[in-house]
Amino acid sequence: MSGEVYILWLLSLIQTLSAYGADLSSEACRELGFSSCWGCSSCDLLGEFSLSSIQPVCKQCCQQEVHMESRKLYPGAILEVCGUKLGRFPQVQAFVRSDKPKMFKGLQIKYVRGADPILKLLDDNGNIAEEPSILKWNTDSVEEFLSEKLEVYNTDL
């Protein structure tokens, strides 16, 4: 029953946001369950699963494929974590302790005492270009984001 209440609440929120034409922040999109890494063509598939009602919000959260094709690949990234706090972030812990980090060219795992998990994307000069917090990301979101931003060595791992 609580799932139905949540869906009704979500639908009313979507209708309100759509009515005002509000642009959603990437954080708001994540809280609604949408990844900003999704291509807008994914939103078009929602109708096949009887989810057409959430399509307007999906469209506000997605990236146009044109932008994705011309996306910038960063030469490197640093994933900073604290070894003692890693257990509080099981999704990040699962990613760090798996073989997945080896898939990404230029990805370094750096253990920084007391640090919450954060990803630092580096430009050609080694300066921080983007610094998204990954506190609430799951393992798949981290992997998907890195596959969009870094060169991938081997996807067979």
Swiss-Prot record:
Tissues of expression: Expressed in the brain, liver and retina. Localized to the retinal ganglion cell layer, the inner nuclear layer and the outer nuclear layer at both parr and smolt stages.
Subcellular location: Endoplasmic reticulum lumen
GO terms, molecular function: oxidoreductase activity
InterPro entries listed in its UniProt record: Sep15/SelM_sf, Sep15_SelM, Sep15_SelM_dom, Thioredoxin-like_sf
Major localisation: endoplasmic reticulum
GO cellular-component term (any): endoplasmic reticulum lumen
Swiss-Prot/TrEMBL keywords: Endoplasmic reticulum, Selenocysteine, Signal
Segment forming the signal sequence: 1-19
Domain of life: Eukaryota
Gene3D superfamilies in alphabetical order: Sep15/SelM thioredoxin-like domain, active-site redox motif (3.40.30.50)
Functional note: May be involved in redox reactions associated with the formation of disulfide bonds. May contribute to the quality control of protein folding in the endoplasmic reticulum. May be involved in retinal development.
Protein family according to the UniProt entry: Belongs to the selenoprotein M/F family.
Name this polypeptide is given: Selenoprotein F
Source species: Oncorhynchus mykiss (Rainbow trout)
